[in-house]
Amino acid sequence: MARKRTELPLLEKVTITDVAAEGKAIAKVNDLVIFVPYVVPGDVVDLQIKRKKHHYAEAEAVKFHEYSAVRAVPFCQHYGVCGGCKWQVLPYSEQIKYKQKQVTDNLTRIGKIELPEISPILGSEKTQFYRNKLEYTFSNKRWLTTEEVQQNVVYEQMNAVGFHIPNAFDKVLAIEKCWLQDDISNRIRNAVRDYAYQHNYSFINLRTHEGMLRNMIVRTSTTGELMVILICKIEKEEEMALFKQMLQYIADTFPEITSLLYIINNKCNDTITDLEVHTFKGKDHIFEEMEGLRFKVGPKSFYQTNSEQAYNLYKVARNFAGLTGNELVYDLYTGTGTIANFVSKHARQVIGIEYVPEAIEDAKVNAEINGIKNTLFFAGDMKDMLTQDFINQYGRPDVIITDPPRAGMHQDVVDVILFAEPKRIVYVSCNPATQARDLQLLDAKYKVKAVQPVDMFPHTHHVENVVLLELKD
């Protein structure tokens, strides 16, 4: 016999009290912690419990009785449906306050180590149109809003280009205007969409993988260059001819595009790292500039998506490193070598290590472009590359700069850092929780001397944090 489904309760007139680490807000009812999206502290709401565990629950606000005094009006028409920019309902001054609190809470509760006063967060000067890269998805299954569903009509146009709906991978929200990237991105996306509608191009079915148009990536840069990459599935010659007609339309309509590229992806997944990139018009790259340095950005290159704030982040890291020109610096998780090349003129030598071979090739090219002679770059898994033998061969670092992925550093990597005993460690993190865990391990030999949070992603809960550690006496 089937188990009887438990009715989940409706809680009335609950006050939202705080913001959680993952961007949802918090309410407490009889010692039960409830996580709620799209509300802010001070809202009084009715909550429909959606999922209940022993110590916490997840809920949806189904009715507002009072709006918080700090609530802001969302500026995006897609707010609440699109999975991005969930903090639009918080004024930016409140967003950075909670991000500062997130850093403090993680370092104190997880790290449990002695800390100096944490510096005020560096907010982003741009809070809209701050990203230099967006990826759009095509789909023949457009997400219908609640209002559209309630109209109970059959929609002729179900193709869409936009963003995936959270927890519904095969559905895409049709985006009319996104506030994350320069408006040229909106104009290109909408023009491609309209051209595809008018000429009956097929959009991919994300379940069956049938259809031509798959993805489009737009990259902008502070130099004014513009890259567009169109990704499609092509199995017949006539499809290729049709696709090139679209590419020519894009080139003619947007002469400001300096790099128009395309990729044929006939696989069942969206990864493009193993696929050939073809140039339809212009160059196969664009450039970013920072303090006179030029960084080559290709279609597959990683580059921090908020260029202006990345510069501020790197300046903090360089300042914390305290370089005099005589130091050997290790840059761990160097990516395309941006930090390594950025600090190179202040160091004797910089050694960068990164898992992705293509990123290391970009790092070498960027060093060559800028005439930098004192960098060495190595590709390989960090825990396999950074060993005592490596240090014995290339020298004991005076300073280590580490910028690991969200998972933080492997225990073996921490152990080798402790063995190397650099005078200073600059730890750049996109996840203060795993950073706090690693700081606790480094506490065996190091003392935290400075902490500087940096907001790279306004209207999201994400926060970067830079920590300076010095070797204890």
Indicate residue ranges for each PLM-predicted region.
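Terminal RNA-binding accessory module
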Residues: 1-78, 376, 384
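Rossmann-like S-adenosyl-L-methionine
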Residues: 2-13, 18-23, 237-473
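Short, acidic/hydrophobic/Gly-rich beta-strand patch recurrent on exposed beta strands
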Residues: 25-30, 162-165, 231, 363
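Short, conserved phosphate/pyrophosphate- and ester-handling motifs at nucleotide-, phospho-/glycolipid
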Residues: 42, 181, 306
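Extended interfacial segments that mediate partner engagement and assembly in macromolecular machines
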Residues: 63-73, 83-202
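Internal alpha/beta scaffold segment
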Residues: 170-206, 210-212, 234-261
